[in-house]
Amino acid sequence: MGKEGVTIRSARQEDLEAIVEIYNEAILKTVATFDTEPKTCDEQTVWFATHDAKNPLLVAELTGIVVGWASLSKWSDRCAYSDTAELSLYVRGDHQGKGIGRRLIEAVLDEGKKNGLHTILARITEGNDGSLHLHQSVGFTHIGTMREVGKKFGRRLDVHLLQKLYPTH
């Protein structure tokens, strides 16, 4: 098990329903994502399949229940971006603030580094201060703010762009 009974592991196909449920909670209740309509497992199957060793998808499991997930996804299909990924992190609302997000980020970043990534980017919506501080505490640097690029719940929202570089050997 891990600290506090939470296990961090690679996602399996049978985790997809829980992953989608957690993401849909964020869609409906937060500005953490700019998706506005809930997703289905069928819709997310292609996304799930894009993850591999270089672009991992990890879950946090507590007493057999998936309570959070983190992924590194290709930033772009253009070849020059092959060593760049975007970090996504979602934890069930009733499990936030318990260190699960930190454990997921640290684990997914370790996997990305081990598998040859150089640059990790994260987009964090204004007002999501907990996520902003969490990312900065694990080495992300704020590199810019995209002003009013999204609209959700009737508000125009800024998005902060953060970056973490792995040293080149």
Short names for language-model regions:
Residues 7-19:
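A short beta-loop-alpha structural element at the N-terminal edge
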Residues 16, 20-47:
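Conserved GNAT-fold acetyl-CoA-binding loop/helix
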Residues 38-94, 105-106, 111, 165-167:
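Acetyl-CoA-dependent GNAT
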Residues 71-74, 121-124, 136, 141-158:
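Conserved catalytic-core motifs of GNAT/GCN5-like acyltransferases
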Residues 87, 120-122, 162:
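A structural signal for short, well-ordered beta-strand segments
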Residues 97-110, 133-137:
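Conserved acetyl-CoA-binding loop-helix of GNAT-fold acetyltransferases
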Residues 112-124:
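Conserved GNAT acetyl-CoA-binding A-motif
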